[in-house]
Structures are given as C-alpha cells and as structure tokens.
C-alpha cells in the first residue's frame, strides 16, 4: 500500500481517510459494485489519476474501506470486563450492528483478509477475551472463529430478508399471508404433524430478530462453556 501522502508533487487536496470515507458512503448507498476510481474522483472533486498517488487501485481502496469499518467493531475506549461471555456477547452484537450499517462488507467477512491495523487490534482483543480459560491457542482461535461465523451467518439472513423486501415490496408477514392457501392444504392432508404444530403453536417466541440473534448466541456460548476445561482437569 502506498504511503499516506505522496513524497513529491503538489500539496494534496484530500487525504486517504477522505478517500476511504467517500468510498464507504458510495458502497453503503449503492453497493460495492458502484466503487470505481472515476466515481471516487468525482465524489471528492479530484482528478482520477491523482487518486493513484494514494492508492494502487480499487482493490487497495476496498482494503482501506474494510479496515475502516472493522475499526467500529470495537469502541476506542474498550475495557474488557473479565467475563468472557459478556465480552464476546457485546462484541458479537456490535459486529452485527456494524455489518447491518455497511451490508457490502458481509460477503467479504469470511474471505482471506489482509493484515491491517484495525483487523490486528480486533483479533488481539477477541483473543484476550478468551485467554485464561484453559484453552490451547488453536482452541481459542476456533472459539472466536465460531462466534464470528454465527454472526456472519445470522446477518446474511437478515440482509437477504431486507433484499427480499426491497425486491417484492412485501414484508415477512405479508409474504407469509400469501402462503396461507397452500399451508391450509398441508394442514388438511394430515401428513406433516410437525408443520401443523409449527403453524398452530409457533410464531410467538423469538419473533423479534434481535431476540432471535441473542437466543442463538447465548446457546452457542452455552455450548462453548460446557466444553471448557474444568478445574483439576
């Protein structure tokens, strides 16, 4: 990655941070596909070629965008509580909120990622949350990876629902209403007793998406806690 400011040439009229902020604004509004060097030059009022004095190209910009968003995963003044469950729960909730604000980062979260300042800070902090539990380092990495995989998977489903709403104009309840005629035939057939129970008994608990996220996360943390080494092991 190129230095923050060019060593030679005219005085810069913008910074790498401004370029990154402009790219994030565009991606938040229109998606990652809208990012191009020409578009970013227009956004910040600069010539397209001048951008190459700060970044090597679009891939470089995307790396800067990701690192800037990852910075929001952790509050700048974060102090760990010493309660690994509470700390991981808070981290998972914050990561979910950040990804929902920047949906374009979701498909990039599970890919190979370049080392960068905020990624390193986030990883180090997450590992400190589970340090001292009697786990090997590989087990610590697996715990952190499992929690992040849960968050990413849950958020992907939320984003898919948001896209379905945008595409159809129907929210989930309106869409479900359209399924009623077929589901009535399912009930009448008597062939699917568990589906009948779902239709008659379900739908009351964990309707709120935030509640469902918290429920699944807590069950995941329960499973991790159950596998922790016990004193004297």
Task: Describe each region flagged by the PLM.
Residues 1-14, 81, 190-200, 232-233:
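N-terminal intrinsically disordered/low-complexity leader segments
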Residues 1-39, 43, 56-63:
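Basic, helix-initiating cap at the start of DNA-binding domains
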Residues 18-25, 30, 60-76, 86-94, ...:
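Alpha-helical structural segments
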Residues 46-55:
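Short hydrophobic/aromatic patch on the recognition helix
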Residues 66, 96-121, 125, 156, ...:
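Amphipathic alpha-helical segments used for helix-helix packing
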Residues 75-121, 137-140, 144-147:
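Hydrophobic alpha-helical connector segments
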Residues 122-144, 148-178, 202, 224-227:
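Hydrophobic alpha-helical bundle segments that form small-molecule/ligand-binding pockets
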Residues 170-233:
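A structured, mid-to-C-terminal "fold-capping" secondary-structure block
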């Amino acid at each position: 990655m190129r230095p923050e400011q060019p060593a030679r040439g005219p005085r810069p009229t913008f910074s790498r941070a401004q370029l990154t902020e402009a790219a994030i604004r565009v991606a938040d509004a229109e998606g990652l596909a809208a990012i191009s060097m020409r578009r970013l030059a227009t956004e910040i009022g600069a010539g397209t070629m001048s951008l190459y004095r700060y970044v090597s190209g679009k891939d470089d910009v995307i790396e800067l965008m990701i690192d800037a968003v990852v910075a929001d995963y952790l509050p700048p003044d974060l102090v760990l509580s010493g309660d690994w469950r509470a700390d991981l729960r808070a981290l998972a909730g914050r990561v979910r909120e950040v990804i929902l604000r920047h949906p374009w980062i979701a498909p990039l979260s599970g890919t190979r990622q370049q080392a960068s300042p905020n990624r390193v800070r986030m990883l180090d902090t997450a590992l400190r949350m589970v340090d001292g539990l009697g786990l090997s380092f590989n087990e610590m990495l697996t715990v952190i990876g499992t929690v992040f995989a849960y968050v990413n998977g849950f958020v992907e489903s939320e984003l898919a629902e948001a896209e379905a709403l945008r595409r159809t104009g129907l929210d989930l309840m309106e869409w479900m209403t359209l399924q009623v005629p077929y589901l009535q035939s399912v009930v009448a057939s008597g062939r699917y007793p568990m589906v009948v129970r779902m239709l008659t008994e379900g739908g009351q608990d964990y309707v709120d998406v935030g509640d469902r996220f918290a429920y699944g996360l807590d069950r995941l943390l329960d499973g991790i806690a159950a596998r922790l080494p016990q004193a004297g092991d």
